[in-house]
Each structure stands twice: as C-alpha cells, then as structure tokens.
Swiss-Prot record:
Listed NCBIfam families: ATP_synt_6_or_A, PRK05815.1-4
Location(s), subcellular: Cell membrane
Assembly notes: F-type ATPases have 2 components, CF(1) - the catalytic core - and CF(0) - the membrane proton channel. CF(1) has five subunits: alpha(3), beta(3), gamma(1), delta(1), epsilon(1). CF(0) has three main subunits: a(1), b(2) and c(9-12). The alpha and beta chains form an alternating ring which encloses part of the gamma chain. CF(1) is attached to CF(0) by a central stalk formed by the gamma and epsilon chains, while a peripheral stalk is formed by the delta and b chains.
GO CC term, one of those recorded: plasma membrane
GO molecular function, one term: proton-transporting ATP synthase activity, rotational mechanism
Swiss-Prot/TrEMBL keywords: ATP synthesis, Cell membrane, CF(0), Hydrogen ion transport, Ion transport, Membrane, Transmembrane, Transmembrane helix, Transport
Organism: Geobacillus stearothermophilus
GO biological process: proton motive force-driven plasma membrane ATP synthesis
UniProt-listed CDD domains: ATP-synt_Fo_a_6
Role description: Key component of the proton channel; it plays a direct role in the translocation of protons across the membrane.
Phylogenetic placement of the source organism: Bacteria, Bacillati, Bacillota, Bacilli, Bacillales
Residues that span the membrane, as ranges: 17-37, 75-95, 112-132, 174-194, 208-228
Membrane topology: Multi-pass membrane protein
Protein name: ATP synthase subunit a
Pfam families (UniProt xref): ATP-synt_A (PF00119)
Length: 236
C-alpha cells in the first residue's frame, strides 16, 4: 500500500520530513554504537569493543582487496562509517513502520531513491576529490584519455553510470523488501485463513531482508573502495 510522504516547503525547496527524521536517527544509532564500543578500550577486547574491532578488520580486508594499504589505509574510517551507516539504515524499516494521517514517518531511509542517490553522489564526488589530491590535477585528468583519447566520452558516461547504479541498486533492494513486507502484513490482517500464511511468510521475508540489507551494505562499501582505487591508484 502506497503512503504519502510528509513534505514541507522552505525557501522554494521541498523537504521530506520522514527522510530527515530517519537519517538523523540512523546517524544517532551509529554514533551511539561507536561511542559505546570505544568508551573504555582494553588490550583484551570484549563485547562491543570486540564487535567494533571485527568491523574494522572486515573493512580493512575490503580495502586490501582493492588497493595497497599504503594508499588505502586513509580510507578505513570512511569505509567503517559507510558500512555501519548503510547497514543501520537498511534495518530501520524492517521491524515496523509508522503511519500518521496517511503519511509514512518510520521507514528505512535507504528505501528512498533521493537518499541513496545523494549518498552515491557524495561518495563519487569524494573519489574525484582524492583522485585530484593524491595524483595531481593534470595526471588525474589524463586518466580520462588513457590508454587512448577516444575513450574520453565513454569514461564520462561511466562516471554517471557508476553513480546511478550505486544509488539505485541500494534503493531498489531495500524499497522492494519493504513493499513486500507491507503486502504480507496486509494479507495477515485482512484475509482470514490466509492471515497465518501471511504472518509466517512475513517472518521469513524479514529474515531474508536482514540478509539482503547486510549484503547491500557490504556491496555499497566494496564498490566505494573499488571506485576510490580507480581514482587514486597509479596502476589503474
């Protein structure tokens, strides 16, 4: 079932209050996890510190698979932030949704293409920034004409394609999952005998959606590092 988004206009611009709320909640959750995991560091990690160190090691492995550590080590914090943010954002809409006067307030922020495409644009812009910073503007721009100059138009198209696919892949998977969860919940509420089937199917789909949300967080972070490697490594 489709629900309206709570929109407000300010200075000629339209803002989605639901997106703003859920983005803020996602940031707060990630911040709280990070603080809780690093508040009292110990030589023998336990609990949250152990989890956070595992996340760092996991992201370190992603970076090492795309570029050498001397080049990619500086992106460790970026990778950890991305994978935690996208994972939490993907999970928020799974347990429940909140509707007020026909408006959808509680959902996964990544179920909105505006959010995922904005995140993709920011990530791709960051790869360009580090490409210029680490290779120099002239050497960076020459990459668009290597190995032959006629590839320049194709490489420009590739930049737009990478941005679109990075954002839309994440949006499509999370949005489709929430739509199906809503349909199964509606089936369980309104269709009698089929209600039990709907409820059990919803639990199975929620478990699958957790898996999908986790994989999408990994893919988004991995592709970010792949794009970064293409911009900052001299052998690409």
């Amino acid at each position: 079932m489709e629900h309206k988004a709570p929109l407000v206009e300010f200075l000629g611009l339209t803002f989605n209050l639901s997106d703003m709320l859920m983005i803020t909640i996602t940031c707060l959750i990630v911040f709280i996890i990070a603080v809780a995991a690093t508040r009292s560091l110990q030589l023998r990690p336990t609990g949250m510190q152990n989890f956070m160190e595992w996340v760092f090691d996991f992201v370190r492995g992603i970076i090492n698979s795309t570029m050498d550590w001397q080049t990619g080590g500086r992106f460790l914090t970026l990778g950890v932030t991305l994978i935690m943010y996208v994972f939490v954002a993907n999970m928020l809409g799974l347990p429940f949704s909140v509707h007020v006067n026909g408006e959808l307030w509680w959902k996964s922020p990544t179920a909105d293409a505006t959010v995922t495409l904005t995140l993709a644009v920011m990530v791709v812009a960051l790869t360009h920034y580090y490409g210029v910073k680490m290779k120099g503007a002239s050497d960076y721009l020459r990459d668009y004409t290597r190995p032959v100059a006629w590839l320049f138009p194709l490489k420009i198209i590739e930049e737009f394609a990478n941005t679109l696919t990075l954002g839309l892949r994440l949006f499509g998977n999370i949005y489709a999952g929430e739509i199906l969860l809503g349909l199964l919940a509606s089936l369980g509420t309104h269709y009698g005998v089929l209600g039990a089937v709907g409820e059990h199917s919803m639990m199975v789909w929620q478990a699958f959606s957790i898996f999908v949300g986790t994989i999408q967080a990994f893919i988004f972070t991995m592709l970010t590092m792949v794009y970064m490697a293409h911009k900052v490594s001299h052998d690409h």
